[in-house]
Amino acid sequence: MANEMEFEKPILELKSKIADLKEYNETSDVDLTNEIEKLEKRLAKLESSIYSNMTAWDKFQVARHPERPTTLDYISLLFEDFMELHGDRTFGDDAAIVGGIATFKGIPVTVIGHQRGKDTKDNLHRNFGMPHPEGFRKALRLMKQADKFGRPIICFIDTKGAYPGRAAEERGQSEAIARNLYEMSDMKVPIISIVIGEGGSGGALALGVGNQIFMLENAVFSVISPEGAAAILWKDASLAKKAAESMRITAGDLFELGITDGIIPEVKGGAHRDLTAQAEEINKTITKSLHALMAFSEEQLIKQRYEKFKKIGVYETI
């Protein structure tokens, strides 16, 4: 229960009450079956009401849930014969980004994604999913390899952002991100990017120059975190909830703005509730997108990607 979120409190309280009644019903002579059934119907309505009316801040909390599935979780369910590749051939390996070659329904692909840790030790090893330059350069090495051998590229995005430490800056963090944007724009193979959790700033963009970009229903994508925006705008990070509502960071917002190409439904309560069911939803999206993009020629893929990003941010003054 420690990982449950504030907006779920009414649901948890009712679930607890139902559990207590069921336990009592098993040991008592009093039949509480009807009362339990009524409460379960009430619970279903309450869950439907709360989960269908989540605010941007609620979704941000779900996107950051410590049990939210990671890139490796999805790789294990979506792909066959995955072989992880390591290192950028310049400085070293970065565990905050994982990637390798695999097959998707018989199609050879390259899979790359941010990787958060599952516990404190793992998070320290993976730097909480915040890549150093060598992580982005490893990703680019794998992309160039995919481009050379004609393998589609599938990227999973889930990071607070690129690591802002001194060592990362000394090794060329901004150049590494910019290089990925530049090189990805000219890849001759299909690129599908999926935001599975938090899409934070340039760290997310470095895997986000795709022919098609999708977001999980409760994922977020923004130039800065709500806490950071609140600290800058109002000098008060505690106003993060207000900032989240103003920033338009949700999957619905990004789709409405024309930045993403679709929203992948999440299981009720968030992807962490049922990994297998959530992987199946992602599977449907990748299948449809991959088959559509593989019908494009190399020139069409490059042109489509260019036109997609050229349109972002365009507006007319009336």
From Swiss-Prot:
Cross-referenced Pfam families: ACCA
GO molecular function, one term: carboxyl- or carbamoyltransferase activity
EC number(s) given by UniProt: 2.1.3.15
Catalytic activity: N(6)-carboxybiotinyl-L-lysyl-[protein] + acetyl-CoA = N(6)-biotinyl-L-lysyl-[protein] + malonyl-CoA
Subcellular location(s) per record: Cytoplasm
InterPro entries assigned: Acetyl_CoA_COase_a_su (IPR001095), ClpP/crotonase-like_dom_sf (IPR029045), COA_CT_C (IPR011763)
The keyword Lipid metabolism is assigned to this record: yes
UniProt pathway: Lipid metabolism; malonyl-CoA biosynthesis; malonyl-CoA from acetyl-CoA: step 1/1
Any one GO CC term of the record: acetyl-CoA carboxylase complex
Taxonomic superkingdom: Bacteria
Enzymatic class: transferase
Domain CoA carboxyltransferase C-terminal: 38-292
Keyword Lipid biosynthesis in annotation: yes
Keywords attached to this entry: ATP-binding, Cytoplasm, Fatty acid biosynthesis, Fatty acid metabolism, Lipid biosynthesis, Lipid metabolism, Nucleotide-binding, Transferase
Main location: cytoplasm
Purpose of the protein: Component of the acetyl coenzyme A carboxylase (ACC) complex. First, biotin carboxylase catalyzes the carboxylation of biotin on its carrier protein (BCCP) and then the CO(2) group is transferred by the carboxyltransferase to acetyl-CoA to form malonyl-CoA.
Similarity remark: Belongs to the AccA family.
Assembly and interaction partners: Acetyl-CoA carboxylase is a heterohexamer composed of biotin carboxyl carrier protein (AccB), biotin carboxylase (AccC) and two subunits each of ACCase subunit alpha (AccA) and ACCase subunit beta (AccD).
Protein name per Swiss-Prot or TrEMBL: Acetyl-coenzyme A carboxylase carboxyl transferase subunit alpha
Gene (name only): accA
